[in-house]
């Protein structure tokens, strides 16, 4: 018997997914894409399989801004166990070393946290998706190869101690793109002299979605099974442009912009801008230089 093919359709928008623990970000994307029957989709930066929380998924024309969301500010809550280091810097790895945990109070932890705030140099976990020689580090580590994880500069905006119940604590971290919370926790453990690893991690928000209304995969499936229109479950692409100044163009200039032509006007605001038609339809992203020259970068077909 021949099985009928599932018809995939064009969807344009952003799904604010509450990723469950135990699956990769790409697996979560593929499940959501299959449920929505969306032709084209992409995620905005990986969450570890252990982690839960906000994973913005972009579909259709919204995939053109996925890279911008990848580079945006993010916030996490991390549950930490002091006294033990692991191969993965989280609870999924094998134990490397166990050390006694000193007597700590909140003031002592708060006193060392500033060492991890600002522009800092951070060594990535060896079990990470960063690539060396075209291959993820975790693939090399799983084969037992010696992995020299890169040291990179990242930006940590804030770290707040939420709970301290030795040997456990909970941190709230706000940071820039590329920051590994596992590495932050590992480094905090070394500063405290006892080692540490993450036992749970939840991403609270990704700019510009600071108060996200997230959907779980189960809730998504239930809504679609109940007959909800897939478009009604997605945010419009324009919501992902909230962090950029808006530049409205008249019909003539907009037509030139859509063709990829450069436009000059000294009244244009310098920097990256989101370009709109006069009736509020996003046309793309552009960069305005100091001479007022608008250069199209990403064009939307909406």
UniProtKB/Swiss-Prot annotation:
Swiss-Prot/TrEMBL keywords: Isomerase, tRNA processing
Reaction(s) the record says it catalyses: uridine(55) in tRNA = pseudouridine(55) in tRNA
Tagged with keyword tRNA processing: yes
One Pfam short name: TruB-C_2
Protein origin, superkingdom: Bacteria
EC number, as in UniProt: 5.4.99.25
Biological process, per Gene Ontology: mRNA pseudouridine synthesis; tRNA pseudouridine synthesis
Transmembrane feature ranges: none
Catalytic EC class: isomerase
Active site: 48 (nucleophile)
Residue ranges that the Swiss-Prot or TrEMBL entry lists as coiled coil: none
Gene Ontology molecular functions: RNA binding; tRNA pseudouridine(55) synthase activity
Family from the record: Belongs to the pseudouridine synthase TruB family. Type 1 subfamily.
General function of this protein: Responsible for synthesis of pseudouridine from uracil-55 in the psi GC loop of transfer RNAs.
Name of the featured protein: tRNA pseudouridine synthase B
Source organism of the structure: Xylella fastidiosa (strain 9a5c)
Lineage of producing organism: Bacteria, Pseudomonadati, Pseudomonadota, Gammaproteobacteria, Lysobacterales
């Amino acid at each position: 018997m021949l099985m009928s093919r599932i018809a995939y359709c064009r969807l344009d928008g952003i799904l604010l997914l509450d990723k469950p623990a135990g699956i990769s970000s790409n697996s979560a994307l593929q499940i959501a894409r299959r449920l929505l029957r969306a032709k084209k989709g992409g995620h905005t930066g990986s969450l570890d399989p252990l982690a839960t929380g906000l994973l913005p998924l972009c579909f259709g024309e919204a995939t053109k801004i996925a890279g911008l969301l990848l580079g945006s500010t993010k916030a996490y809550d991390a549950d930490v166990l002091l006294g033990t280091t692991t191969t993965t810097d989280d609870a999924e790895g094998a134990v490397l070393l166990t050390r006694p945990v000193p007597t700590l109070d909140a003031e002592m932890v708060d006193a060392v946290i500033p060492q991890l705030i600002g522009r800092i140099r951070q060594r990535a976990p060896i079990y990470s998706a960063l690539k060396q020689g075209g291959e993820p580090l975790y693939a090399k580590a799983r084969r037992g190869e010696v992995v020299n994880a890169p040291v990179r500069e990242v930006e940590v905006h804030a770290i707040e101690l939420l709970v301290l119940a030795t040997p456990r604590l909970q941190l709230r971290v706000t940071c820039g793109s590329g920051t590994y919370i596992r590495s932050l926790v590992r480094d905090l453990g070394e500063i405290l002299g006892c080692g540490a690893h993450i036992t749970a991690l939840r991403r609270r928000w990704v700019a510009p979605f600071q108060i996200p209304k997230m959907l779980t995969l189960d809730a998504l499936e239930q809504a679609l099974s109940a007959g909800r229109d897939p478009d009604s479950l997605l945010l419009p692409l324009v919501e992902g442009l909230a962090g950029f100044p808006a530049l409205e163009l008249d019909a003539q200039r907009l037509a030139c912009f859509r063709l990829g032509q450069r436009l000059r006007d000294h009244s244009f605001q310098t920097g990256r801008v989101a370009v709109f038609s006069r009736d509020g339809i996003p046309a793309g992203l552009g960069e305005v230089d100091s001479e007022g020259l608008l250069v199209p970068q990403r064009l939307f077909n909406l």
